[in-house]
Amino acid sequence: MIYRANKPEEAIKSQINKEKHGIDFVDAQNLWRDENALIIPANIVDEEIRYALISKFQNKCYIAIFTLRSDIYRIISVRRCRKNEEKNYEKDNGPRV
């Protein structure tokens, strides 16, 4: 399970993310379907490890910040990749020799 809006504030946060970055947390779940997605540790907040997922959805590169709680990926935010983040994605998924 990736995203559940169990609490009203989760649905609100998803809507705010869509208004700000053009993608809500429901659509963002598709980022985990990309076989070429990169997951890297991002930082630690209040002893909780946060990860960055760099992935493509509808031919656009996104970065999702998330954490794992009780076997559920809790999405914190999602936005379009910056140029250097997209280059890292492309570099890691470039042609294989």
Predicted stretch roles:
Residues M1-V97:
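Ribonuclease/tRNase effector modules and their secretory precursors
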